[in-house]
């Protein structure tokens, strides 16, 4: 790895800034991380991630953690799934091995949007319990059913960041203050 590899992919002013600083890769990465933290600002006091385990596989846990940890130091997550959904059992291991993750398994038979509705109810409850200007919510899903609650959060003054798959539609992506894409590789 060359000391200038960090500049690969940068264009325009960003490339000019990177080359003129004389900073190493590590220093430039730290500068970028601090800039990201400024985006969060006061919203970083209460940070919550709501993960829809039905459409985001547990294999993305490391990327989700990296994305959120680049922006804030302290955060908590809730992972939602149906109790008998074996496809989401990978999230059970994630919750067991991470103190900041709470697993919520919904009982009963499958019903249309059961998990989505529970996540939305919990997010709405959060709005009443936190100071909106000090709160940041990450919604980890590719399901556009969350667009309405994203709008409600933004109107209340909450910073809302989406994390989802590349297949997420443009309207859903644009409803967030920022959208981070999960991709294989």
Protein language model regions, located:
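Domain-level signal for Mg2+-assisted phosphodiester chemistry and nucleotide/NA-binding surfaces
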Residues: 3-125, 152-155, 159, 166-167
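Small/polar loops that bind or transfer phosphate-bearing groups
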Residues: 52, 138-142, 164
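Extracytoplasmic/secreted cell-surface and envelope-processing proteins
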Residues: 59-60, 146-149, 171
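Acidic beta-strand-to-loop metal/phosphate-binding motif
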Residues: 80, 135-142, 149, 153
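Short, internal active-site loops enriched in acidic
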Residues: 85, 143-145
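Glycine-rich phosphate-binding loop signature in dinucleotide/nucleotide-binding domains
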Residues: 129-134
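VWA/integrin I-like adhesion module and closely mimicked acidic/polar interface patches used
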Residues: 150-182
């Amino acid at each position: 790895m060359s000391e200038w590899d960090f500049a690969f992919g940068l264009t325009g002013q960003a490339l000019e800034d990177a080359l003129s600083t004389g900073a190493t890769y590590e220093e430039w990465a730290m500068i970028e991380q601090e800039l990201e933290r400024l985006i969060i600002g006061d919203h970083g006091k209460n940070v919550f991630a709501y993960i829809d385990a039905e459409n985001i596989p547990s294999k993305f846990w490391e990327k989700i953690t990296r994305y959120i940890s680049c922006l804030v130091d302290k955060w908590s997550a809730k992972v939602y799934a149906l109790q008998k959904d074996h496809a989401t059992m990978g999230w059970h291991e994630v919750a067991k091995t991470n103190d900041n993750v709470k697993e919520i398994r919904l009982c009963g038979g499958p019903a249309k949007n059961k998990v989505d509705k529970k996540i939305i109810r919990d997010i709405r409850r959060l709005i009443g319990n936190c100071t909106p200007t000090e709160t940041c919510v990450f919604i980890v899903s590719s399901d556009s059913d969350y667009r309405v609650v994203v709008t409600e959060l933004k109107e209340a003054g909450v910073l809302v960041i989406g994390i989802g798959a590349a297949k997420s539609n443009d309207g859903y992506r644009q409803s967030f203050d920022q959208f981070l894409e999960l991709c294989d590789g």
